[in-house]
Structure formats: C-alpha cells, structure tokens
C-alpha cells in the first residue's frame, strides 16, 4: 500500500500533538517535497511508526536508525532550539562604552573615519547574474497559491477563477491517489480533510460548518456547487450550459469585430483571437482560421494563398499553422527592406570593375545633366502684394455722420417743424399760413413774387435769416425793397 494512503487511512487515529502535526503538514506539501521528507526524515518516520503499526521505515533509514539513539537526537534538537531563542537578559553597557560609541558616530558623520572621499562606493559586480533568471522558472515561489481564500475578493470573475483553479487541482490530487481518496474506507473523510486543509477564511468555515457526508454524490462536486451558490450566487450544475452559451456568443461576436491596423501589433491581435477561438466548437475552426488570415494587412493575401495550397486536413483546423505562415511572409518582407536600404548605399562607380567592357580605346561619353534656369526671386519684396478677391463684396460709398456737426434744417413729411415766415410760428409753411390774407408780411411776399423772387429753404444761418426778414419788414416802399434785394443778391454771389 502507498505510504500516503496509510497516513490518510489512519489519520483519525493520530493524536493532535505538536510533534505529530508535522505528519499532517507533510501531506500538504508538493509531491517532490513530500517524498523527500518521508524518505529522509528519520525522526518523522519513528514518530509515525509508534502510532501506526503498518508504517514501514525506508531501507535507507532502517540501518541508520539501528545505530543512533533517537532519544539522544531529540534531546540535542531541543537544546539547539533553546539556544537559538534570544535571551531576555539585557547586556549592561558601561558609560565608557557609551562615550566611545558616541565619539565614533561623530567621527563617522564628519568623515574622519576611513577614507575621506565623499563619493559613494562602487557596487561590486554581480557574479551570479543568471541565478535570478533560473529561479524564476522553477515553479511558484508562493506556496499559498493552491489554497483557496476568498476574503475581500470583490470581483465575481476573480472568485470564479480561484474556485475553478482550486477544484481542478484537488481533482488531480484525488485522481492520482486513488488508494487514499477513492478506494479507502474513509475516502470521503480524507477528501474533506484535504479540502479543509487547502482553504482559508470564510471558505474554510463554510466547509467545516456544512454536513457534506450526509449528501449523495461526489463530495468534491458537492463542495464546489456549494461554493458557487454561496460566494457567486450561481447554480453550478444548472448554469454551466447557460454560461457556456453566453461565452460562445461573446467570443463569436468578438472574433468578427477584431481588426488589425498596425502589423506591429500582430502578437497581441493573435493572442486575443486565439483565446476567443478555442471557446467555440471545433467544426467552426477552418472558417475562423481563414477569417484570421483575411484580417492581416500586407501579408494576409499571400499567407492565405499558401494556406490553401499547403494546409492538410489536420492543419486546416490549426490557427498556429496560419500564424506561422504569416510570420514567414513578414520575415521575407523585412529581409527585402533590408536589402533595399543596402542598395541605396551602394556605390555604382564600382560596377565597371565587375562588368566586361564592350569598347576598347574609346573615349568615355559623359552624359551631362540638363540645366534648368530659374528666374531669381528675391526673398523680400518692396511692394505690397495685392491679392485678388475670390468673392464679390460691395464697397462702402457712405461714411457715418459726424455727431458734432449740426444737423441740416429741413421740414420732414408729416408734422412740420419749420417756422412760418408770415406769422413766425412753427408747424406750417408760409404758403399754408392761415393769416396770409390779413398779414402785412404776406403782402411783402406778393411784392417779391412780382419781382420774380421766390422763397428758399433756409440756406443761411438763423441770424442772417432774421436780418433779411427785418430788412423786408422795415421796407415800406418799392425802392427800399429793390435795394434789399440787390444787397441779398450780392451776398449770394459772394
């Protein structure tokens, strides 16, 4: 029987003592570490053999155990553990030691100790540069990655990924150890104990507080279904087909909408396309692979032709084969571009040394380059360049009125504001005056009309008008009127 199966079979008979808890910790180790610990740890084998009669000590340790007193080894280990613990007694420091330490610190701050240079010391070369790179490739450094802990994990997708990864790992452990987890009488108890050991926080409390042994079916499937219900709010058995259909619909839509515009982003595009391709059924792979080649710019057409010629019945389903053809065509284009760059730097004068001549003793004909005369154009012009208008815009033929200038006097239509010459009242003209028949001034106007004169529309200032009217009013005879008319005519000519 397997050594691990014996441990799980008698796990309930092992008392919970600090020395024997080591046996339970060994079961939670990785397979290589677990085998190494069970094969080379003599003390652990002795302790297990005292509790489990079926336990067999390996041959490599049986000879060694006969010549070594186990009690002496245990006592020596306890002494070493006690010596490794720090003592609680504090060392008494004298005042002279304190003064010496203080002076040393002051000297260090002033730079008096050691070299006086303020430069930072050079870093020593790393002699093991590749050690870190090698260690990165050796498994997971964190041993708690395979332990399920959903405390403060808020994202439902993260919770689902953690539960699925945990369930897949446990299923592999149970499948590879059937003697302990499948065919053993207490296989269900062993599985449950292993799941409790591989969980923390709220998941561990949920597993311990539920009566899983009273349920029918596989205990691992029941636990995973319970985790889906409690921490994701989903039915694990009922929603699997529904969620699978939704994922397929999203993947199909994304494959249609994906585009590649820059050929330098080919690897990211391929990764996204590949991750969604394998969510769909296999009978759709050939058409989706051709669709991938059609989305590739520059080299997609050549790669698709090669795919139709070279693809077999098996490789027609392979997206990796199509991606390989695309990379090969890209490599050809890159090599051609490198050659073109080299040809630009190639000196053509050396071609005559490699070619056989057709003429001997003839003068070489040099082709002259045709010269083109170009009219000199000064950089700066003295005159302003007048640009033609592209569209018609009417010019401005009127300028705004000057607010300071006096307004021209005229009688607008409607209400008249000019003053009458007969009655000297605003609101009407002299020919419309109601007092024109009785007024003496109207008679003077009639006399002026008889001499061929007519009234004008205020061409003079107010003072000149008043003076002219006064002269007309004061004249009582025709001779005086003639004199005033001659004076007014002379003023107009002036």
UniProtKB/Swiss-Prot annotation:
Belongs to the caulimoviridae capsid protein family. Self assembles to form an icosahedral capsid, about 50 nm in diameter, nm, composed of 420 subunits of the viral capsid protein. The capsid encapsulates the genomic dsDNA. Following virus entry into host cell, provides nuclear import of the viral genome. Virus particles do not enter the nucleus, but dock at the nuclear membrane through the interaction with host importins. Its main location: virion. It comes from Carnation etched ring virus (CERV). A zinc finger (CCHC-type) spans 418-435. This is Probable capsid protein. Keywords: Capsid protein, Host nucleus, Metal-binding, T=7 icosahedral capsid protein, Viral penetration into host nucleus, Virion, Virus entry into host cell, Zinc, Zinc-finger. It is found in: Virion; Host nucleus.
